[in-house]
Amino acid sequence: EYSYDGQWIYFNSHRTGRMHVYRMKPDGTKQEQLTFDAFDNWFPHPSPDNRTVAFISYLEDQKGQHPFGREVKLRLLDTQTKKITDLTPVFYGGQGSFNVHSWSPDGKKLAFVKYTRFN
């Protein structure tokens, strides 16, 4: 997904053996890994001010997949410090929870889908 200022494209890649968040310039240069933790991180969406990137993290190893019906959490990455903050506690979600652009125009809210468990 493009940053609002058009300077970066944010994406996820499994190139290290675990899914992580990256960014690169629109011409493909300056590729930079942004997450380095033990989670599989998916669906990065930069904020309107380009200061943070929201994404979901799977708590169990999904081996490059992003299924629905798993334990995930919504997290924020500070693009300057690279610090990651948990925005939500663990919830039941995954594929379909946070796939599309989800920031409000003023950057103060995020929309996401939380599933109900049926046993």
What residue spans do the PLM features occupy?
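Sequence signature of WD/YWTD-type beta-propeller architectures
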Residues: 1-119
